[in-house]
């Protein structure tokens, strides 16, 4: 309870909300992570998972039934027939479900839940309001953590974030590593670097007016403990000036080069939002390590990928809500 006339600071509000959250969740978190109240690990469990369809994750894998997976603590010790003896193991019936290695999601924005927006909105203005006081910041951070947990519940055990709110992604990563929350392993970029009028500028990326501002944001990201750096080199689908032609070049090649050189000097890989052939070439020629989304390739682009040792992270999941929705068919999908 605060005295009349005294306002709660952002830090106090976040700490208070966090404390309340942990008090209600502590027992569940400890149980789910196999910890005692003193933080020490419980006696490790030996479990035998049976009655499942096994996908082993190898390149030539095929679904295999009637197998049992033996797990000792956090390690898989054997894959045997369903009928094999398993004394000393707690048997877990998977009820004909699929059992497979954890998935890796290489392109995640934890600031959103993945659902398509019902109508256009000013994301930059929304983010300014969210970050304007401690209470809304704390609520937003809890939402970010809940979206990370949803990834884990969907079978994703590692995610790579490529643009988020403030330092929320690295905080979520660290809280998960400490066992405070349930989330996948996280490789975090926090806020990306964009330009005025560029993709995601003001929401999950900072608008840099010049190279000095871009490098200043890179240093801030380093202080937050990021695992990688994200650039917004071109426009995107939602902010295309002409519908159906995303990828207008926004960031100057000189800025791309400056950030990549400094990021590599500091030991960070650089991922770049690029959605046009021109943007991909600018990114690869100036040191980017991964192309996010990508565009149609020609021989020069293929050569640049090889020379740079870069890769493309294709992103088909944004279209899935539309592809899987019963309200969208070839007859009802807008064509203009």
Predicted regions and their residues:
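N-terminal metal-binding scaffold of metallo-dependent hydrolase/deaminase domains
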Residues: 1, 21-25, 39-86, 97-100
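Divalent metal-coordination and catalytic microenvironments
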Residues: 52, 69, 74, 96, ...
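Metal-associated gating/positioning segment near the N- to mid-region
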Residues: 98-175
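Histidine-centered divalent metal-coordination motifs
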Residues: 107-111, 273, 293, 330
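Active-site mouth loops of central-metabolism enzymes
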Residues: 129-142, 199-213
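Histidine/acidic residue-rich metal-binding segments in metalloenzymes
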Residues: 171, 212-312, 326
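Conserved small/polar residues in nucleotide/adenosyl-binding loops
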Residues: 329-335
């Amino acid at each position: 309870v605060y005295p009349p006339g005294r306002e709660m600071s952002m830090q106090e509000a976040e700490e208070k909300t966090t404390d309340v959250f942990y008090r209600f969740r502590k027992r569940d978190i400890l149980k789910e992570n196999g910890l005692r109240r003193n933080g020490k690990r419980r006696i490790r469990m030996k479990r035998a998972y049976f009655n499942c369809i096994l996908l082993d994750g190898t390149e030539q894998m095929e679904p295999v039934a009637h197998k049992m997976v033996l797990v000792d603590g956090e390690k898989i010790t054997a894959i045997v027939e369903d009928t094999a003896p398993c004394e000393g193991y707690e048997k877990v019936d998977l009820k004909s479900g699929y059992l497979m290695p954890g998935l890796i999601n290489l392109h995640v924005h934890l600031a959103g839940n993945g659902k398509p927006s019902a109508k256009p909105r000013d994301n930059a203005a929304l983010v300014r309001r969210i970050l304007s006081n401690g209470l809304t910041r704390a609520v937003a951070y809890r939402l970010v953590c809940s979206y990370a947990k949803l990834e884990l519940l969907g079978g994703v055990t590692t995610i790579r974030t490529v643009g988020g709110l403030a330092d929320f992604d690295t905080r979520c990563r660290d809280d998960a590593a400490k066992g405070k929350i349930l989330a996948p392993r996280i490789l975090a970029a926090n806020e990306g670097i964009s330009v005025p009028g560029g993709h995601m500028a003001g929401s999950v990326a900072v608008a840099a007016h010049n190279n000095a501002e871009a490098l200043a944001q890179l240093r801030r990201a380093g202080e937050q403990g990021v695992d990688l750096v994200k650039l917004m080199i071109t426009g995107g689908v939602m902010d295309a000036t002409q519908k159906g032609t995303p990828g207008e070049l926004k960031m100057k090649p000189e800025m791309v080069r400056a950030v990549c050189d400094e990021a590599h000097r500091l030991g960070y890989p650089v991922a770049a939002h690029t959605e046009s052939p021109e943007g991909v070439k600018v990114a690869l020629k100036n040191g980017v390590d991964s192309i996010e989304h990508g565009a149609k390739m020609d021989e020069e682009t293929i050569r640049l990928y090889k020379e740079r040792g870069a890769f493309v992270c294709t992103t088909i999941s944004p279209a899935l809500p539309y592809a899987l929705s019963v309200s969208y068919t070839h007859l009802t999908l807008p064509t203009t």
